[in-house]
Amino acid sequence: MVTKKNSRSPWAWIPTLYFAEGLPNVIVTALSVVMYMQLGLTDAEVGLYTGWLALPWVIKPLWSPFIDLLKTKRWWVLTMQALIGAALAGIAFSLPTAFWFQATMCFFFLIAFCSATHDISADGFYMIELDEHTQTKFVGLRNTFYRLAIIFVNGFLVMLAGVLQVLFRNQIRFSWALIFYGLAGIFIGLWLYHSRFMPRPKDDVQTDRTVGEVAHELKNMFRTFFVKFGLGETVCVMLFLLLYRFPEALLNTMTKTFILRPNSQGGLGLSPQEYGFANGTVGLIGLLLGGILGGILVSRDGMKKWLWPLVCAITLPDVVYIYLSYSLNSNLIVV
């Protein structure tokens, strides 16, 4: 297997690169929720503060065109991985302090920004390093290792945090500090590995365009989009993109606190170990199977036929959570 410019096998760097891409995303959006809840924040505080952490991924298209103005994509990938590793260590160091909340929020924001930039650079590097045929061939591998990162954090690490809390007699901060020390070590290891094994494509060069030229191109792109489709169609497209996964987005953060809160506080009262198994392992397997089935149906009959059934399918979990909120059924098999 060869790339466009190098003889180095994509198997040497694609799995680890996309595992590294998935880790910080789920650490910031999922692991932080569980940690803050266990450290005493209310549901309202958890929802407010962790909700803001997703902002860098929302607005990353605004700075993605400017990445090539400074250094290469490979440089950005390695630099962001090093910064993420340092920020994870910063979270671990700051957890035992009196200002742990302010410090960890700053580090989580840094991780979110670095992760969004890493996504841009890693995807760009993938496209310039591999020819179109090889890109298509490795799409499945990319997605697999990205999902494995989600399983690792949502499944294994949450369960490990629960086990550590039992071993260290409910020392919650110390247990979470150990988790983040471990994550910092993993990311520093990934950074060192990629420094050695990521190829150096000849096409990965710093652009000679200026900031003004890139900003002008970005402005023209938005203008062309609105002129081509018209204001009415553009508004409809934007509303569709906003609302299609809106029910899922509403559930994303608060389901974690709902599952972990005790029955006396309106939750299901699962332990971190049970949560990790139910949500991070079994739930993700269901997500993968659903994605495969949806892909088969769409490829066979087209998106037009299955669009509204899929809209209903993505809203179905809301009904399940309504049932669980009324019944407060803590049976792990039911959950």
Feature map (PLM): residue ranges:
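Hydrophobic core of transmembrane alpha-helices in multi-pass small-molecule transporters
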Residues: 19, 87, 99-118, 330-335
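Helix-to-coil boundary motifs at intracellular loop junctions of multi-pass secondary transporters
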Residues: 35-39, 69-70, 125-130, 258-268, ...
